[in-house]
Amino acid sequence: MIQLPFIQRLKWEEYMALFLGFFFVIFEKLLSCLAFMIHNTLGLFYRSVVRNEIKKRSKKRSRSRSVSLQRAKAIHDAADIREMCKISGYYVEDHLVRTEDDYILCIHRISKDSPGRIGSPHPKKLPVVYCHHGLLMNSEVWVCNVDPRNCLVFDLVNKGYDVWLGNNRGNKYSRQHLRFDSTDKEFWDFSIDDFAQYDIPDTIDYILKTSGQTKLTYIGFSQGTAQAFASLSIHPLLNDKINSLIALAPAISPKGLHNRVVDAFVKARPSILFFLFGRKSILPSAGFWQSFLAPKFFDAVLAYCLSQLFNWSCQNISSYQRLVSFAHLYSYTSVKCLVHWFQIMRSAEFRMYDNDQLGHDYFLKYYKAAKFPTNNIRTPIYLIWGGSDSLVDIQAMLNALPAEVEHVKVDSYEHLDMIWADTVKDYVIPPVLRRLRDIHHPPEHEENDKENREIQKNHIAPRNKPI
């Protein structure tokens, strides 16, 4: 028999969460229908206004500023990662990974060579670096920097590393399954457990086999770090295939959200959240809103949401970079995955997904979902985290990880600053390169980077201006 959340005993916060969530879903549906009816006329008007505004501003800017503006617009309008990389003179090889449970993941190999050369394995056997994105994202977030000097991926390619970008099941590049269609409920029946059990280890095995290497360096951002922690904790042999885990804005057990009402909503029982959002993709209309709204308005809406949910100001990210980044920020994932994160916030522990069949807090003293045994990880871990990041509880993270973890704090950085701030080239890329040099012999033709010598363990020395 199906249990409906409104006939269960709920706390008053959960009744409020149910009411607000129901109101939000209905309001968003009505607004979507209205917007769809006027999309062809008003949407085109919005975009023409923005284009004219960009043209006017570009005439008033200096030549260098105008080039940045044109580059920002080109990246903003790029349809996929291949177009985005081509703007900066890089090329993309697409590779398909079949997971053990039959999802087809599209991953990308970034190169400065022409697309005609598909060198697998690479004749020089370059050190392999595998980068993985965060929640509700895809591989594009790594290459949408307006200033290419702030792009970690491009810098690694320039330094002679064999760079691969992963994608989670369900996102823009990984919506295929051998038995299910993306419109099927079964396709979206996955959580962080499945990323850890299948996506990460199967992708790593493919990359190592294709590159001819026995080990790689894993660089994760946000949920990409949590997936690695979880996967390494439940796959002991995977630890022998990763020489170092570099975690940018690492996430294991966020404290919660800045807005108390929304925080109560997200910590509600899964039955409530599934009742409101269904059991497929979370907010499938987000792509429509992005295409409908003027870029500046879409940027303002997202900035407001980030401020309300996480208390982020995005002060370290330029206005151009924010417009570009937000255009490539969202990608699909399952409602179940988001529910899993809400369960982690609710328990304040990095646990496996809980189906919540028992339904009441009373039973929690008899039953809890298993914790990921992250203390068992043998791979060397290097954390780079922001002092103003509301999603990072560094002490809780250090308690959950092995004692040998090294970490670097960037004082004023928020979560998204780790990949998009104007000073990534000063405060993120140098410690990453230093860590890689500690692991590998310098690749052929690598230039000395004086910046790395200014990096000290657990500290980054400011250059010219404080962080």
From Swiss-Prot:
Glycoprotein in keyword set: yes
Residues with PTM Phosphoserine: S66
UniProt feature coiled coil, ranges: none
Topological domain spans for side Cytoplasmic: 1-17
Pfam families (UniProt xref): Abhydrolase_1
Upper classification of the organism: Eukaryota, Fungi, Dikarya, Ascomycota, Taphrinomycotina
Lumenal compartment segments: 39-467
GO cellular component, one term: membrane
Subcellular location(s) of the protein: Cytoplasm; Membrane
Residues carrying covalently attached carbohydrate according to the record: N311, N316
Spans traversing the lipid bilayer: 18-38
Major enzyme class: hydrolase
Domain AB hydrolase-1 stretches: 127-421
Protein name per UniProt: Probable lipase C1672.09
Active site location: S222, D389, H415
Bilayer disposition of the protein: Single-pass type II membrane protein
GO molecular function: sterol ester esterase activity
UniProt cross-references to InterPro entries, sorted A to Z: AB_hydrolase_1, AB_hydrolase_fold
Transmembrane helix in keyword set: yes
Alphabetized UniProt keyword annotations: Cytoplasm, Glycoprotein, Hydrolase, Lipid degradation, Lipid metabolism, Membrane, Phosphoprotein, Signal-anchor, Transmembrane, Transmembrane helix
SUPFAM superfamilies: alpha/beta-Hydrolases
